[in-house]
């Protein structure tokens, strides 16, 4: 298990004036997208146990209902509809061989959902699509070659010479890792404009209940579908580009002795999920050391003085870290709001939260 800390400044705040340096990477636009279909978390247990033909598992259903009620998630957007599940019944059992079916759907749908977010980011950026020099695509949903980056290049009509990088199976750490990677690419390629796209669809992890695997119920409750995109570059052109955030620094740390705490494993039945009960506590116990290393060069040690874009892996993680750091209730407000409205969006989650932070800041003129 690893943590990534990225130091950002907003371009309208006083702290931006303090740290802004020519040549630093800046986020120039953000776009997000979700499937039109969505589920209400309060009624989802009824749907889930009905569509998987598991209504006879009454105790298990009540357990799932309690998990959903405690999740602090209001709704989630899902590509999976009742019609799609009825056409593909192998997705509704727990361990039936179904990887081919899942892959066939994901290979097509992941780039399409990514395109929606990318087009929104490109529109906000306001520059010709031909000026995009790099494409980084990230997903935990499916694996193929040519990859989703190649398919998105064709869907968007990017230059055939665009420099592409495909990132598969990076999990929840991927959102912050994409910020780090985009910063490195932008600052190493002066004048370049990097399109970063994170697109996640949970078809690979959806399956019927298992009496032996409680982790599966958590996965069915927690994850949602969505895509997010951003344009990153250095030295914005006056009157042509409007920077939103500046990427000051980024660091990644492996937490010792956590190899088995959080795992996604690809099997013939799809992607299986394991999350140790210790994850919230372990993250809370280790996060401050990471923060100290990241912010000490800038003389910052008051964690309530900074704005937070915290990946909300789950409500218990948010609560535990907030308590451990002594944060005020508003510090994680954007993270909690995204978790409530979309669930855990894996790699796309951090960019959704960035978008939420900038929208709230603009609304409040902060």
Swiss-Prot record:
Gene3D superfamilies on file: 3.40.47.10
UniProt GO MF annotations: naringenin-chalcone synthase activity
EC number(s) given by UniProt: 2.3.1.74
Active site: 172
Transmembrane segments: none
Record has Transferase as a keyword: yes
InterPro entries on file: Chalcone/stilbene_synt_C, Chalcone/stilbene_synt_N, Chalcone/stilbene_synthase_AS, Polyketide_synthase_type-III, Thiolase-like
Recorded metabolic or biological pathway in which this protein acts: Secondary metabolite biosynthesis; flavonoid biosynthesis
Keywords in alphabetical order: Acyltransferase, Flavonoid biosynthesis, Transferase
Reactions the enzyme catalyzes: (E)-4-coumaroyl-CoA + 3 malonyl-CoA + 3 H(+) = 2',4,4',6'-tetrahydroxychalcone + 3 CO2 + 4 CoA
Biological process per Gene Ontology, one example term: flavonoid biosynthetic process
One of the Pfam families matching this protein, by short name: Chal_sti_synt_C
Family membership noted in the UniProt record: Belongs to the thiolase-like superfamily. Chalcone/stilbene synthases family.
PANTHER family attached to this UniProt entry: CHALCONE SYNTHASE (PTHR11877:SF104), HYDROXYMETHYLGLUTARYL-COA SYNTHASE (PTHR11877)
Function: The primary product of this enzyme is 4,2',4',6'-tetrahydroxychalcone (also termed naringenin-chalcone or chalcone) which can under specific conditions spontaneously isomerize into naringenin.
Name of this protein: Chalcone synthase B
Source organism (scientific name): Ipomoea triloba (Trilobed morning glory)
Gene that specifies this protein: CHSB
């Amino acid at each position: 298990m690893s943590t990534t800390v990225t130091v950002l400044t907003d371009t309208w705040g006083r702290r931006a004036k303090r740290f802004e340096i020519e040549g630093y990477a800046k986020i120039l636009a953000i776009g997000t997208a979700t499937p039109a279909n969505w589920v209400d978390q309060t009624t989802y247990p009824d749907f889930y146990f009905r569509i998987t033909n598991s209504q006879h598992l009454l105790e298990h259903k009540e357990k799932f209902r309690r998990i959903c009620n405690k999740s602090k998630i209001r709704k989630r957007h899902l590509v999976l509809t009742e019609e799609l599940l009825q056409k593909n019944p192998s997705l509704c059992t727990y361990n039936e061989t179904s990887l081919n079916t899942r892959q066939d759907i994901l290979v097509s749908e992941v780039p399409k959902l990514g395109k929606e977010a990318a087009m929104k980011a490109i529109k906000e950026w306001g520059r010709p699509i031909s000026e995009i020099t790099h494409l980084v695509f990230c997903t935990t949903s499916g694996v193929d070659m040519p990859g989703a980056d190649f398919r998105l290049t064709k869907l968007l009509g990017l230059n055939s010479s665009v420099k592409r990088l495909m990132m598969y199976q990076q999990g929840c750490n991927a959102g912050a890792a994409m910020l780090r990677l985009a910063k490195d690419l932008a600052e190493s390629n002066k004048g370049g404009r990097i399109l970063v796209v994170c697109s996640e669809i949970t078809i690979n992890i959806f399956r019927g209940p298992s009496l032996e695997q409680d982790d599966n119920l958590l996965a069915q409750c927690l994850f949602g579908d969505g895509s997010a995109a951003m344009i990153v570059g250095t030295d914005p052109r006056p009157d042509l580009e409007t920077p939103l955030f500046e990427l000051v620094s980024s660091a990644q740390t492996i937490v010792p002795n956590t190899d088995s705490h959080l795992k996604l494993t690809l099997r013939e039945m799809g992607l299986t999920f394991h999350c140790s009960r210790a994850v919230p506590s372990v993250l809370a116990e280790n996060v401050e050391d990471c923060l100290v290393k990241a912010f000490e060069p800038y003389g910052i040690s008051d964690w309530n003085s900074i704005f937070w874009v915290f990946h909300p892996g789950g409500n218990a993680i948010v609560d535990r870290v907030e308590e451990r750091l002594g944060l005020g209730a508003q510090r994680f407000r954007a993270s909690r709001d995204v978790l409530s409205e979309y669930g855990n969006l894996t790699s796309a989650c951090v960019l959704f939260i960035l978008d939420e932070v900038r929208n709230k800041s603009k609304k409040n003129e902060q």
